[in-house]
Amino acid sequence: MLCGIPTSGKSTYVEKLKKISYWENAVVLSTDAYIEKQVQRLGRTYNEIFDDVIDDATREFELEFNAAKNDGRDIIWDQTNLTVKTRRKKLSKLPSWYHRGAVYFEITLEEALKRNETREGKYIPKSILKRMYHQFEIPTTTEGFDYVEKIAI
């Protein structure tokens, strides 16, 4: 499970991870990926369509999760997963035999805001990004993870 605020590098990490043979067949669960497909299909920006497609993206996410879980496939959760409550809810849906790992992305607020400025069509209002930064709780093994890894940006 990837954990970190927007702009921290989670999706870039997934792209690199998928090139490693062990992870190449893993199912990547990402509402952002679904939204990006709709961006391409509709020729609009992420921000322009977000409110219109987030419910569909969430449904697609759940369908993909259930299929992957039922098939026993490796799953990479590519979402913010900012709080203990959010992560525990997701972990509770996994069968007990699943190996549970958390990779969290440590980034300064200044760097996140700087990166946010360069995101064309996917800009997050500063107030929201700041709120998410302050909401973020570093994952621990007490939440049910077998291991926790930090990636410092």
Predicted regions and their residues:
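The conserved Walker
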Residues: 5-6
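Conserved glycine(s) of the Walker
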Residues: 9
